[in-house]
Regions:
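Core domains of carbohydrate- and sulfate-ester-processing enzymes
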Residues: 68-103, 191, 211-216, 220, ...
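Glycan-recognition and catalytic regions of carbohydrate-active enzymes
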Residues: 4, 8, 357-374, 429-430, ...
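Short edge beta-strand/loop segments characteristic of extracellular beta-sandwich folds
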Residues: 20-27, 550-552
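Short proline/glycine-enriched turn/loop motifs at strand-loop junctions of beta-rich domains
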Residues: 25-31, 555-557, 564-565
Length: 595
């Protein structure tokens, strides 16, 4: 069971069978007390702001807190679990008691990946890890290979997206216990599904973050982020806390990878950037498993994604490609507000570039910011780019949380879904997308008092004067905003739901049979734009064994099919000499036939 335990510098750690060391960096305090169950035990200052105490006879499930000189009791910032919310007692967890899971499971190759992004709280009516287990066979049968779980680190309240986490090592209690999350991951592995966790290392949430009280030096007042003072990554105890969190989740929970949120907001002046250090430590510590590390970075840069002579990725594996989404969204909806203005002019050409090259912005000036954005990315193979037409951000950050199907209609959405799943980029589906879910995914929280008021007013202000949504923005703290965001599983049994599922399943079967084998070559691919016109795109990718081509039309008029060589892998609806409105055709030409 060795891989189920990870020794942290912070927190409650078993140092022998029945002795637990409690250790916390509290440089802002002169003394500290451990409240263990009913007993208050003085901790020892061991230098450089650290306090610790070794206590015999501590058992799994024992509750504890740290007590400040003024009597304030706070949770352990490195808590493995909470007895309740972020303000209450932490719980001692003996990770040695967890079963080892599937010892044979070593993960899946990245080229196989079809990502399914889900939010535990809204994925099922119950909103728990255990309830989500019941849906795993459905995902495996559909053709999903990787589940990407939105952040589960404990955050304020019971409802939230998870990006306001404050206890990085503790699964959110409203979703279940550590045992429940272990069970979810083990069940997924038993079905051949990888599990990746979205992790937030760029800020802490506004409720339940006691680090400024324990250690003001954890933050840098000179380094501002959208969420307040930045994290002082250069400080050694801070660096230990941040770098060990990813290793903890991968080791103790046997996860298959991590998605690193908004890394453009992680500013580190160290000689070695903290993200590089994290990736190197992960690769060194877990050499025998398929570990996939993806990044979200609005800068469109690739310095953390080098490739060796064999095409392997010694640091991070891939990057979310917002440019693909934004171009596809403008192409399908015609919306040009906010960041969509960068894709407003000739969106068909921008989407064609996203398909063939990856980034749309590779050094060009953004209309929104007036600054150059991005770098050339021709050195990266197609599987470097994680593409999507929907995700939690792009849906939930709309005032009304509308999904693409509600904005562009079912037919256009089907065409774009087919292009997504049959392109050589790595596709990501957002929960419910596979059966044509129309329920919104809204921004929801569970704050109270002045914080709730500030969030409510801030959300309304954000959309005031924007498409007339200001007055009607749902209150994030209203429980109905959360309830409305839950997946409607009843739709799966409807005729429309069944039609969508057949469509998605067909596409994923084709992907696994025809696209994945091309990606396993691991080579840089030549992408080519064959033709574009308003509402129409035709592109191709030349692989060593042949050429993959696709053409689609979302316009109101039929257009001639461009000259696409090879056998038809997929067409919807039937495509012969012309591309009807809202249609797509995908072809593959072997070897010499593709030249």
């Amino acid at each position: 069971m060795e891989f189920r335990t990870f020794q942290k510098h912070w927190g409650a750690e078993f140092i022998s069978n029945d002795v637990v060391r409690f250790r916390v960096w509290a440089e802002g305090q002169k003394e500290l007390t451990l409240r263990l169950a009913e007993n208050d035990l003085p901790m020892t200052a061991v230098g450089s702001g650290w306090f610790q105490i070794d206590v015999p006879g501590v058992t799994h499930g024992t509750e504890y807190q740290y007590v400040l000189p003024d009597g304030m009791a706070v949770p352990d910032p490195a808590s493995r679990a909470q007895a309740g919310d972020v303000n209450g007692p932490s719980v001692v967890i003996d990770a040695r008691r967890y079963p080892p899971g599937n010892r044979e499971w070593a993960g899946r190759p990245w080229e196989d990946t079809v990502i399914y992004e889900l939010h535990i709280g809204t994925f099922t009516p119950e909103g728990t890890f255990r309830a989500a287990i019941e849906k795993l066979p459905y995902l495996a049968e559909l053709g999903i290979t990787q589940i990407e779980v939105m952040p589960v680190s404990q955050f304020g309240g019971s409802r939230g997206w998870g990006y306001d986490g404050v206890l990085l090592y503790a699964p959110h209690a409203a979703y279940g216990t550590p045992e429940d999350f272990h069970a979810f991951i083990d069940a997924a592995h038993g079905l051949g599904l990888s599990v990746v966790l979205d992790i937030v290392l760029n800020h802490f949430g506004p409720e339940g973050n006691y680090l400024p009280v324990l250690s003001p030096a954890f933050f840098d007042a000179e380094r501002m982020t959208p969420w307040g003072n930045g994290i002082a990554y250069e400080t050694e105890p801070v660096r230990q806390y941040i770098t060990e969190a990813p290793l903890f989740w991968l080791t103790e929970y046997h996860l298959d990878g991590l998605r690193f949120d908004a890394i453009d907001q992680i500013e580190d002046a160290s000689d070695k950037h903290i993200l590089q250090e994290i990736a190197e430590r992960i690769r060194e510590a877990i050499p025998g498993r398929q570990i996939h590390l993806t990044t979200e970075d609005s800068r469109n840069v690739i310095f953390l994604h080098p490739r060796d002579a064999h095409g392997a990725t010694p640091l991070f594996t891939a990057e979310w490609n917002d440019d693909f989404h934004n171009a596809a969204h403008v192409f399908a909806t015609g919306e040009t507000h906010a960041y969509y203005q960068d894709f407003a002019f000739e969106p068909e050409k921008k989407l064609a570039r996203a398909l063939t090259e990856g980034f749309v912005y590779q050094g060009e000036v953004s209309l929104q910011t007036g600054k150059s954005r991005g770098v050339e990315c021709h050195t990266q193979p197609p599987q470097f780019f994680v593409d999507f037409i929907q995700n939690h951000d792009q849906t939930g950050n709309r005032a009304q949380g509308e999904r693409l199907i509600a904005l562009a209609g079912a037919d256009k959405t089907r065409v774009l879904l087919a292009a997504l799943l049959l392109s050589p980029h790595i596709p990501l589906l957002f929960m419910g997308e596979e059966f044509g879910e129309t329920n919104p995914f809204l921004f929801f929280t569970d704050f109270h008092g002045e914080l709730a008021k500030a969030v409510r007013e801030g959300r309304a202000k954000e959309f005031t004067g924007h498409a007339g949504h200001g007055a009607s923005v749902p209150d994030p703290n209203d429980v109905q905003t959360f309830v409305r965001s839950k997946i409607d599983w009843n739709k799966v049994a409807t005729d429309d739901g069944k039609t969508w599922l057949r469509f998605t399943r067909t596409l994923l079967t084709l992907r696994h049979h025809h696209i994945v084998p091309l990606l396993r070559k691991g080579v840089t691919v030549e992408g080519k734009v064959i033709r574009t016109a308003p509402g129409m795109i035709a592109v191709s990718w030349r692989f060593p064994t042949g050429t993959l081509s696709l053409a689609f039309n979302t316009g109101n008029k039929a257009v001639d099919v461009p000259a696409l060589a090879g056998e038809t892998l997929f067409s919807w609806p039937e495509v012969n000499e012309v591309l009807p409105p809202n249609s797509i055709v995908v072809r593959f030409a072997d070897g010499e036939a593709s030249l």
